[in-house]
Amino acid sequence: FRDEVNHPSQSADKYYQTKGGYESLIVGCYSNLKNIYNTTTYQIFTQQGTDVFTQNYPTEVAAMNQYTTTYQSNNGTIYAMWSSYFNALNNVNAAIDRSKSVILKTDDPDGIEPSALTQLVAEAKALRAWYLFEIVRNWGQGPLKINESKEPSYTVEYSNGAAFYQQIFTDLEEAIRVLPWRQTGSNYGRMSKAAAKHIRALAYLTRGYEEYADPKDFENAFKDAEDVYLNSGHKLLDDYAMVHRQSNEINDEIIFPIGFADGANYNTNIWNQWYMMPYAIGGWLGLGKDSYYGNASMHVEAIPTKFAYMMYDWQKDRRPSVTFMSPLNGNASTSTDGKDAGKNWFQCTTPVDGVFAKGDKIIYFPVPTDPEYKYWAETDKNGVRYKVFNYPMGDDTNWANDDYYKHAYQTTNSTSRTCLPIWKFKDGNAEYREDESGSGTRDIYLFRLAETCLIAAEAAVMNNNDQANAEKYINYVVSRAEKHSPQGGLSRYSNVTIDNILDERAKELLGEGSRWNDLQRTGKLAERVLKYNWDVSNIYGGTIKTTLTQESFERKFKLRPIPLQWLNSLSNGHE
């Protein structure tokens, strides 16, 4: 993307009529993606309160994770996300509205080519469709903004979900007619036909569950997803590890990334801090703040549930070794970040005389692909200087005796947990920063083809239980997962169910996509959260009760509440 240029002597209206000005306006529309998806707020909003992620600090009552009585319309996370989506929406509306005044090359030699302008507007419409979709799937209604707001508005009118989807599909149809299947070269990272069709497939799929659905929604979702798979030129990579290898981040599977790069203002990705054990504040002798592990935010907001660890078969499935700290990630030639820090143990970064030398083992996580993997009894643990945290075993719904979920187990930090970190987002270029600001350079994958396959599989199940296509597309993903695994033999699906789809989405996309929306869309949130998220059903040992039930999900939790802070800013906010 091009750098934006400030022209203080020129009005914004005049500047955005020029070729360079309008191009910078579109660049700004893409920059808004970082303001939404590169935030810990987004992590809380999309991962907490699910079957595969829970809170790191068990001594806190977390409304977004535990669905307590404190989950109300004044929730700051919900307001922040609402504001981010509408701010981004206003910028794309500005780009679309102002396109009518852009000077064309047919009228001025310095103007923009009409075909180039048409494509930029199509990109903006695809982005607008995505933001509108995010709003409607999370809140179900709201002000349907399709024009730029240049001044504050203190009165609004709500539009229902059906109206939102009508606009979404109109924008996507117009974008799909114009955009190329893929964006390459200097245009890589821009909206494409494949990205727009992926969005439309997901939008059809999501609307298909609603009371106002069109009878052909699931059929249309499948058609769009299959079209992307067959005709876009995107391919599932042979090796899951190569999907997440930082040195291979531009690859055939990625449909739409959010771009980061070296250099000031571009190296701001914070995903490498997510799901990372807060090692530097955990009271660990010999583990200090160091760029070897980079930032591990003291505000880690989500850690995997026991179910998230135990759903994988490490011997038959390549994905867990890529996803978590593991021997694979401890080898610079195979690791996701090209370094050796991802081995399944933390090493000493701050030597302690007579106790730990630099590089000594401090915390050890036995994992099933480790040649020395075993269950460590307390007597075994007492025989070594370092601390050992056993991999979860037994009932995946009961965490009471698992090392990962004990409060301050073997550490002086009385609030945090110590569990095997997710490593697939780690960044070989990130550095340690005291202010915890982002320093990562790797892209965020917003859409990739494996998810498109799982959209196709889910749509097939919901479209008159089309098992032939459901099995085909879910097993494309499973077949790739088996490749390069230690043993192979990963079972394929037959008679696919929605729970199978949710399981496979969790394994393939852990931490990448919005898990909360997957459970919300399918109506499985209460069932799976109450079963697999111990922190929801055992708040303070059961002394505080969650308000989540299937009935309360349908009545209250299926949609996010309209933020009270926003309503209070309106003159008609309480009508």
Where are the language model's segments positioned?
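Long, intrinsically disordered, low-complexity segments
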Residues: F1, T54, Q72, Y85-A88, ...
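Short coil/turn linking the two alpha-helices of tandem helical-hairpin repeats
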Residues: E134-P143, T206-P215, N464-N465
